[in-house]
Amino acid sequence: MLRVFSLAFVALSMCYGQASAQVALQVRFAPGTKSTSETDVKTHQILTLAGMDVETRSSTFSITTKTIGERAADGTLPIQEKIDVLQTEVGLPGGNTLQFDSSNPEKKAGNPLLEPLLERLRVSFQNPVTVILDDKNKIKEIKLPEGVLESLDASNKSLFDPVKRKKAAEQARGYLPDEPVKPGESWERATEADFGGGQTMSFRTKYTYVGTVEIDGQMFDKITGNVFEVSYSVDQAAPIQVAKSDLKVTESNETVLFDRGLGAVQQLQRKLRIEGPLTLVINGTNLDGKLDLTIEEKTKRQK
């Protein structure tokens, strides 16, 4: 009886140990390697002002290759991020559309007022970004090709600012937990999104480690995310100001499949919907309105 009890206790201990085992989820950078991923982003926005709906839609498909260089003597590591394919279509009020296709990047906008938007896409496609990591794999700086910033107009310059790019790059991988986690454990992150024109949205997201899942014979670590707080702000120098806003997250779901062996994201899928009233100040006049914004994103590692 004692032997049976001992075996049962050992089995129970093993099961408990497996259930509570912690895993470390860390991004890895193997010098001299390449990886390619494709991303599909869709947005739908309805901004209601003075009783009129202003609706815009956009869809962007991109294929990006990351090339990891070799460690320098000081321990720094360069990673070049190059967009191989970029296709964007924007539906604007009044039935107007804006299209960009990297197979014909120099094609001009039908409406000259929209040319700055196309120029932003051209610059993104034609200029690889280099991320420099330090000896501890923290982002040290972001480098753009020489002369890129100087060539941009004021409306686009902030989107390519190396300091802002560094912050965005840190956020892009900052959702991973700082410490080893076990299934069911959660953590929170605060992030910002720069929409250009001095507009910034700030988010708070709760992430949860679900555990391992098997897909096509391969094991991945699954993480889910839920945005639970959002705020909207505009720089004081912007032509349009926000007097007040009460935006809420009405729909949020995010799923990440992480390849622990490679130390890389295999797949990311998220959807976020934001709704609520806001008051804009345009030419000194307060305009009450409401915002309904939906953002969907799918990213998958190809190789």
Predicted regions and their residues:
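N-terminal secretory signal peptides that target proteins for export/translocation
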Residues: M1-L2
